[in-house]
């Protein structure tokens, strides 16, 4: 299926940021990136078996002092600009799971007929 260049670029940047974060912060032995196409949606899953983190502390740090967490913030922003959803699940010692769902037909688009 043909994917709009704006979606392809956003997905590339999201995966790039996630893999960079895994490399820099996770101390992971394994990482998995999985992309599926289901019912006019792109589903992106990124998993690692690294050290994990407290998502609330990272979110609070972004808001309180403006440092840290910008990679997660930019991934969220890219997904939201495409009317998608993102779930980031992580706990210290349990690795990280990122699940993203992006509609391939953006608002106002559709099939004729």
What are these regions (language model features)?
Residues 1-113:
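Coiled-coil dimerization/phosphotransfer module
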């Amino acid at each position: 299926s043909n994917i709009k260049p704006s979606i392809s670029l956003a997905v590339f940047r999201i995966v790039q940021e996630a893999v960079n974060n895994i490399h820099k912060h996770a101390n992971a032995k394994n990482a998995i990136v999985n992309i599926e196409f289901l019912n006019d949606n792109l589903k992106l899953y990124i998993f690692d078996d690294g050290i994990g983190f407290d998502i609330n502390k990272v979110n609070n740090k972004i808001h309180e002092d403006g440092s840290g967490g910008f990679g997660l913030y930019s991934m969220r922003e890219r997904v939201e600009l495409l009317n998608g959803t993102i779930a980031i699940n992580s706990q210290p010692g349990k690795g990280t799971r990122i699940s993203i769902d992006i509609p391939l037909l953006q608002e106002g688009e559709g099939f004729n007929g």
